[in-house]
């Protein structure tokens, strides 16, 4: 049965602060679970990091099935897509959403522009056709132990295997077309991240 739970975030200083940012799997990602994925990091502190994939739609279960399993009353017209959030806690339903609607349990991030909620109440509101304007319903999540994500970014097996990073972009995350291919957003993110990294290196060369 699908479950929802609440959580509190303790923000601490990390070597690399990825909280509220997008992690993009490199083209040579060695872990098949993360190939061609874009991950929104909703927590990053000294205990580790957690995020949800935002570009992999689930064929099953759909929103109707999740509501039925959780005994959540759903209006027939409400049937949002469900996204595969990651390879752990695959029975946990989360909602990544705009902050025009939040609960006391919502984790607000990115200058309060986006929230991530692990709370049954959010699912109940959405099932009534209410709630935030923009949302991604996720099933499962990605998780890293303390310092693990920093190590994967700073000291990968080869430079080509390092995660790419982008600032959060509402249009990228919530602007995905309903009929777009799952890889479309990943390809756009890789392109943007490479351009950003190239500009950063070029700027550093001129400064030095």
What are these regions (language model features)?
Residues 1-14:
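Short, Lys/Arg-enriched N-terminal segments with co-localized hydrophobic residues
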């Amino acid at each position: 049965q699908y479950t929802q739970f609440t959580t509190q975030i303790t923000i601490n200083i990390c070597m690399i602060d990825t909280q509220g940012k997008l992690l993009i799997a490199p083209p040579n990602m060695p872990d098949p679970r993360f190939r061609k994925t874009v991950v929104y990091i909703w927590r990053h502190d000294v205990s580790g990091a957690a995020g949800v994939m935002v570009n992999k739609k689930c064929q099953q279960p759909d929103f109707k099935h999740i509501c039925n399993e959780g005994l959540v009353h759903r209006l027939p017209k409400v049937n949002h897509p469900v996204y595969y959030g990651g390879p752990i806690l695959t029975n946990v339903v989360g909602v990544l959403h705009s902050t025009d609607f939040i609960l006391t349990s919502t984790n607000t991030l990115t200058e309060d522009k986006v929230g991530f909620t692990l709370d049954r109440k959010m699912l109940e509101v959405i099932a009534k056709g209410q709630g935030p304007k923009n949302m991604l319903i996720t099933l499962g999540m990605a998780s890293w132990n303390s310092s693990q994500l920093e190590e994967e970014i700073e000291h990968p097996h080869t430079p080509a295997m390092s995660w790419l990073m982008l600032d959060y972009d509402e249009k990228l995350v919530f602007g995905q077309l309903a009929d777009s291919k799952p890889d479309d957003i990943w390809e756009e993110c890789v392109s943007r991240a490479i351009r950003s990294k190239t500009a950063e290196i070029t700027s550093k060369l001129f400064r030095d």
